[in-house]
Amino acid sequence: MTEQLKQKLNDSAVLRWSVLALVAFTMLCGYFLTDVMSPLKPMLEKELLWDSLDYGFFTSAYGWFNVFLLMLIFGGIILDKMGVRFTGMGACLLMVFGCGLKYYAISTTFPEGAMLFGFKMQVTLAALGYAIFGVGVEIAGITVSKIIVKWFKGKEMALAMGLEMATARIGTTLAMVLTVPLADFFGYTDEGGAFHTNIPAPILFCLVMLCVGTIAFFIYTFYDKKLDASLDAEGLEPEEPFRMKDIVYIITNKGFWLIALLCVLFYSAVFPFIKYAADLMVQKYHVDPKLAGTIPGLLPIGAIILTPLFGSLYDRIGKGATLMVIGSVML
């Protein structure tokens, strides 16, 4: 009985994997919206009269605040200072607000010629919503990583991270595959007999999913509070305290910069392609727009399968540097 009282909440495998499912689902919802506009590019040009410059401006918005306003760095500091519950809920609300603004922009007909910052009013507002969402989803990502460390430290941590990332990538695949069918399903035929796709419909679907994902994270916060109580009972700190000297240690660590460089090269090689991949299938290979997203939608399948596999392997044998080299060669 004494042993049972001393057992921490994260010693329960059922609870560990349950909370992982909750936060991983939240990330799946976020990744769905991240790439939902990619298959819609040809329709944006046809229905809303966007051009490639408008779309490029919009899709670049994801990094505006994260890069130029250093929001990810500030988000990390807030996470260390305020904890996963406060930061995670804040990130979820940012995602919902950003998606809501994006939906408003895409679903609203603005006066012809209305401009803001040199671009169409609709494009600028959609980009602003996407930029706000980008802050939320990236901060949510680092929050979920810290949650996994908190619950799985000394256990199946790499496998848990791999499964979380695989679940999030399911969101990417769903965005590429389901977006156009959703837009067509809710489309309409005008008085002249011409069919129009309903571009706002997939974004509204994302907004609903993000609300559900936020509820899932809210449910998680109760488990997190109980975990903190069980750690307090053991005399352990629920989370490591933030220290300013940690920042100095990170920026002077050569290993950190090497890993960061690898991530930059990976992101610059893969993710911009996904934004234009569906349109590339249509323009260059004349693929039916209804199916164009399915082809790049296959890209994350490898990550969905292999990321948990390599995570489990890392838990068993270590050798993280070797696995990173293998991953780089595969890329």
Named regions from a protein language model:
Residues S18-S52, F273-A278:
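Extracytoplasmic
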Residues L93-G118, V329-L331:
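C-terminal ends and interior cores of transmembrane alpha-helices
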Residues V123, G129-T167:
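Cytoplasmic helix-loop-helix junction between adjacent transmembrane helices
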